[in-house]
Amino acid sequence: MKEILQDFDKSFNLASKISQNQDKEQLISVIENWEYVHENVRPVFSDLIESFGFYPYLKEKESLGTAALIRNEYHKSEYLKDDSNGNLTFHFEQKYLEEKISNNQNLLVSAPTSFGKSLLIEEFVARKAHNNIVIIQPTLALIDETRRKLKKYDD
């Protein structure tokens, strides 16, 4: 992958294939190897990252157009901060679930460990809109981790 990303023509061809095939796995691989992406193709990959809804992974927001910047801002949390103390950005699926729950729609969510379900739980606890929230976790370790993480919202 590194070899492909460092070569302009190969990198551009990869971006084209990702776009045509809607290949999320390949795009994730590009994100993981961002430091190797040819400088002149980075804006193309930034557009792809944005179009796939991977907003938290946008590295070079200055190359995005106004509409893309607006979509990126729309996916930001009002309550949670990221490591640089800016507002945390949800990816497309997280924002979709956040909106459903905000509109009082009941959901059952099954997603991989890395999806960010715990982040959504933290978002709703941080809002302090509810006095009682029930959180069901599959293991004692995860229950304890969640309890420690949410303790900062205790009044």
Regions found by a protein language model. Name each.
Residues 1-155:
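N-terminal helicase ATP-binding lobe
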